[in-house]
Regions:
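N-terminal Rossmann/SDR dinucleotide-binding element
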Residues: 1-101
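NAD(P)H-binding glycine-rich loop region in Rossmannoid oxidoreductase-like domains
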Residues: 86-124
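Conserved Rossmann-fold NAD(P)-dependent oxidoreductase catalytic core, especially the SDR/UDP-sugar
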Residues: 104, 130-176
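Flexible, glycine-rich beta-alpha linker
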Residues: 151-153, 176-177, 201-219
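Glycine/proline-rich active-site loop of Rossmann-fold NAD(P)-dependent oxidoreductases
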Residues: 183, 199, 210-223, 232, ...
């Protein structure tokens, strides 16, 4: 990734909202999923905190694809505060690391990959977390699990969902492999907390977007900006009336670190920007307007339809995480503009 001045500024400004970030000083933080949309930004934010505060945070990037990690972070992999660790979520893990914090973000989240590999989606979520929970228990580490707003399922009404609002999931639909695995993983976390006093905390991100998405990410909020950068209009395969909680990736990273520091043991926290609860269509229009392009409509194929998120409303409340002192900075129009500007200057 090309670290543009705008991206660096976005990360720095979002990091300024983290309450009590001095708590991270001198800590060892082990992060999975750092090649992906969310946790790559978390790594960038931790490096920024080190640069700004001389915080001495040791960042361990767990990866099963070293070349992809090096491609993502470039020469930053050579920094003294960065250590790359071979890691596969489905295999036993042994490393001479005693982390203070574990951030577990490794998970299939791409809708196309989920539908093509539902079994692997379940296994990687459950097996990977089980291994890390054992490490957290043994090493007395705090483990933050990155779950998903999809755990809420389908629920009547259009009000934003709070952390206790649970709806219906069709467990015989293979597309449910992802939310079902995430639900099970959350229960594993609180079960370890109950039985072994393991220090766990959970975040449930809404729909996260930004310039750190991977090339293979087929989610609409990643595909749309890629198409615009290629000079294409946005093609929507539905009316786009579903309500979503969108959150710019820099705000999501600061939310994760805020919960890591101040979240209550055994609790779950939504990650949502209350100023970016919009429909998929409105999200598409924000990106199109920023690029001076159009939103056009087409009919989805059968294979495309089966990968769709079935929730008509996955908007989330943010009051619980805001009670920790966190706040989002970037609304949807600004986030769309920044995403496109950063991607253009990264080519």
């Amino acid at each position: 990734m090309n670290y543009t001045l705008l991206y660096i500024r976005d990360i720095s400004e979002a990091a300024s909202t983290i309450p009590c970030r001095e708590t991270l000083r001198g800590k060892k933080i082990f992060i999975t999923g750092a090649n992906g949309l969310i946790c790559s930004a978390v790594v960038d934010m931790l490096m920024t905190i080190n640069d700004e505060d001389h915080a001495g945070i040791s960042i361990f990037i767990a990866t099963r694809n070293m070349s992809k990690t090096i491609q993502r972070f470039g020469k930053r992999c050579e920094r003294e505060d960065i250590t790359l660790v071979n890691y596969d979520a489905t295999q036993p893990f042994h490393a001479d690391i005693k982390p203070d914090y574990i951030i577990h973000g490794a998970s299939a989240a791409d809708p196309k990959a989920i539908m093509e590999h539902p079994t692997a989606t379940i296994k990687s979520n459950i097996q990977g977390l089980s291994i890390l929970l054992d490490i957290a228990t043994k090493q007395n580490s705090r483990l933050l699990y990155i779950s998903s707003s999809e755990i809420y399922g389908i629920k009547e009404g259009g009000e934003p969902l709070s952390e206790n609002d649970y709806g219906y999931i069709d467990i015989l639909n293979p597309r449910s492999c992802y939310p079902s695995a995430k639900r099970t993983a959350e229960t594993m976390c609180v079960s370890y907390t109950k039985e072994y006093a393991t220090d766990t905390v959970i975040v449930r991100p809404g729909h996260i977007y930004g310039p750190t998405m991977t090339d293979s990410d087929s989610r609409a909020s990643s595909q749309f900006p890629r198409d615009l950068i290629a000079g294409k209009d946005i093609v929507m395969k539905s009316e786009g009336l579903q309500q979503r909680s969108y959150c710019y990736v820099a705000d999501c990273a600061s939310a994760i670190l805020s919960v890591l520091i101040k979240g209550e043991r055994g609790e779950a926290y939504n990650i949502s920007n209350k100023n970016s609860i919009v429909s998929i269509r409105q999200m598409a229009e924000s990106f199109a307007q920023a690029a001076h392009k159009q939103v056009v409509f087409s009919t989805a194929s059968k294979s495309e339809k089966v990968s769709f998120n079935m929730m008509s409303n996955s908007s989330l409340t943010s009051s619980k995480i805001e009670s920790l002192g966190w706040r989002a900075l970037t609304d949807m129009p600004t986030g769309a503009e920044h995403t496109l500007n950063i991607l253009r200057n990264s080519q």
